[in-house]
């Protein structure tokens, strides 16, 4: 099954638990989502499907992916763990593909503590899933499928249900916070942001800054850490992980390039404006220093 390496490991773990071998695709350097044309080149008679990811909450290139899947009679599954609140052409992200899997874990903008949601195109798949999540049976205790205990507890379900009411206001607030970051760093030419196509609404589970050079990322990370600001280098490419290196059969230059330069910065509901401004100032100052150091080093090498 074709899947991006630039994702959280659980995307690929799920394929392996179902006996599917991952074939790693590269991602688009602007959106960080799966590169449709790269995926096209990986299709063989053994390919059964594509697992695409809505990276950081940005919808993947859905229409071309659905067209590609139809052309080759492939299943299309979306890892929508970051996708609650995101929209593609005015539709919620659960409306696409054969299935979409959303996370409600504690790091998401809507949470049930743990657990998630699954949407299906085919009602028969949805019905089968109700068996699979509860040992494979219903009230009669007659197993029709080999299931597992994947039920959400009543407490977690209640928390998630109540949290859904917060989705729209929380997402609107996050968009305001992101805009404040972008405005504060608009004069920093060594930084770029994840591109958001005009027909998409970003879910902003995470906010990633792309630095021109790895040294600038390292400098910003160190400066922020010194002030007690948590950041993360996200994602660590799956094809580089110990357990998945045997499936790394080709170079993924964009994935590796992003891995060396992206840094996720603070984004949460009660993040004060003053802290956004302070984080932005630290990033700007550290990036400028790193650029000056790299320029000087280049001059010395050429002298």
Question: Positions of the model-derived regions?
Answer:
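Structural detector of well-ordered beta-strand residues that form the stable sheet scaffold
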Residues: 2, 23, 76-77, 101, ...
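Histidine-centered beta-alpha loop that forms part of the nucleotide-sugar donor binding/catalytic region
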Residues: 6, 20, 27, 54, ...
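PLP-dependent aminotransferase class I/II
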Residues: 37, 49-53, 62-64, 87, ...
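Short beta-strand-to-turn element immediately C-terminal to the catalytic PLP-Schiff-base lysine
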Residues: 102-103, 116-122, 161
